[in-house]
Amino acid sequence: MARTIIRVPFTAGVDNTYNVVVSVLQSNGYKEISYNGETVWKKGVGLLTAMQYIKIEFEENSLIVSGWVQAGLGSKGGSEMALNGVVAAVPKKSVMKVIEEIKRSV
């Protein structure tokens, strides 16, 4: 799995932080889905641009945010791509902007 992983410390409780993150994700058009047995947030279907994914996890007082894109259509998508490099640069930048918004919000 090629994912960009960012650890974000937080001081509010887990429930409050989760609600803030969900609000940011929903306001940016992400939908909660099950993906290979994981609960993740997804935007897009891969028709015109790569599908965008964000996964959130909690570990002590840190929020762990994973982001990646996947080119292809629906469940027939290609392999996961971390948020660096030039392939699919526009959707990668879009995912990073949402992650930065999450970091500012918590």
Model feature map: region roles:
Residues M1-V106:
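Ser/Thr-rich, low-complexity intrinsically disordered terminal regions
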